[in-house]
Amino acid sequence: ESFCKTTGGKGLHVVAPLKRDVDWSELKAFTKKIAANFATAAPDRFTINPLKRERHDRIFLDYLRNDRGSTAVAPYVVRARPGATISLPIEWNEVNARLDPSRYTLASVPKLLASRKNDPWAGMTKHRQTIAAAQRALGLAA
């Protein structure tokens, strides 16, 4: 089970609630393998290279957020950017070619939240998964 949110910038964060049964280095290695598989399968679309000058028009898969001490913007945070964009939890069906994270702003989000029938992250705290099953399913077992 995973959940998605905008970053308040151009990106998205995928959040997967996990049991504390692996250490940070194991988790980072796992997420790096997933990201590298995407980058290898579609090198014209994805990259794991953090250097902006090397990305061109590719999507940067930032597995580096999965390390002890790394930070990621919290949900519902207003970013210090033009338009006062917000890091907003969204439903997976909202992740499509029409998604425009810049429309989630301090001005627009209160109305959006009032109109939502469900919290996209409802039940998140009930999920605690291991990465072992995902590793096996993806052929990434250590």
What are these regions (language model features)?
Residues 25-142:
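C-terminal accessory nucleic-acid interaction domains of nucleic acid-metabolism proteins
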Residues 6-16:
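Short, conserved phosphate-binding/catalytic loop or strand-edge motifs used
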Residues 11, 21-23, 68:
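Generic "edge-of-domain/loop-turn" microfeature
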Residues 2-8, 49-53:
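Short beta-strand
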Residues 15-27:
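Catalytic palm subdomain of template-directed nucleic-acid polymerases
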